[in-house]
């Protein structure tokens, strides 16, 4: 997903091969409704596993070089623990006219697992030759047995450039698309690209014999 919540992320440190962003969870409320507890935050993202605990997710898009490989890791700086929490399970989208059903994965809620299994998800994407990392953080640990919810308040997210990457084909830059691309990345102010821009072209769509006329040649 290209959705991102940059207000929760700020640059902390940067070197030639290493960038550190600091995550701050900001406003957060843990409330109760019926037998379940819910989490409200300023995030637009939520975990989507139906019947499993619904947790806020936070993400940003980071521009990268198409000829480099990257690794991302995180360090938790501060956290808070909430006791006796039963996190509300995520529900499917309600369709008008259909009977509302409540779904809860009882097997998961009675397990010894920690949820979520991964707190950091990284997806490399290519948009017409423009490369980026979509970095998603789920700053929570939920223990089904103890009903303990750990909330990461502050995290360092470390992006490391690790090695060269072989390219099969280099797509030229597009001035129009580059302007759109910069709106989606957190590091637009330091974005660099050594590729050449593509030459402007005009596409003609015609029929009949017009393409062979003198007017068309002119």
Task: Enumerate the predicted regions with their spans.
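Extracellular pro-sequences of secreted precursors
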Residues: 1-218
